[in-house]
Amino acid sequence: MHTLDEIRTAIRQLPVDQRWKVEACLRELDGSPIPDSQVREARPAYAGLDPAIMTFEEFFGFEQKSPLRHEFVNGAIFAMSGPTLIHNLIMQNLMFAIHAHLRRRRPCEVFSSGVRLVIRRETNTIAYCPDLIVDCRADTRDTYYLRDPKLIAEVLSPSTELIDRREKLLNYRMLDSLEEYVLISQDERRVVVNPRAERWKPRVYAGLDTAVELRSIDLTIPLIELYADVTSP
């Protein structure tokens, strides 16, 4: 019988596209975060530039001066693409629904993509810019970063879908505070909720006659409201 390390060594000899799928299955088994090399193979089409290597402290200083938003993954930085009009409409609808729901549920707050989320685990340091975060831990909030989200939502796009579904899911679930990870489609009326309580098994809500359940914050949103004013595609 081969050890896990021996299997990993053999997998590294596979073509990139095959290796991605097999390593994703292995990470599901041992719960490890996504490897740096794997991230950099998936990111170029999304970032549009070669990753630069720097410390997290250097990244923090760089980000304060940059007019663009970036994400930081274990020393590599990646520029973020701008959102579409449909993306903005969906996020406005989601923000409005959650903000109204949480107004009397302090200390929970909802934050948009301008706020970064820091993940630290052993030797890994990651800073993401989720589209939406619900945070109920006022005691761990920083001026610029959040650390203990209760819910994270991302609106999918062709350039980010692979990253949101694979890399970010694997890294987000390392956060003990996270209860739900929500993926919202722009191309169809479809929302996928990945709940910790169900071992991250996705719940799928599709069609304007359905409503998405965000059980972590006790909120149900009809998809017809989430996609209000979205006239295409």
Give each language-model segment a name:
Residues 2-10, 17-233:
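Gly/Pro/Ser/Thr-rich low-complexity, intrinsically disordered segments predominantly at protein N-termini
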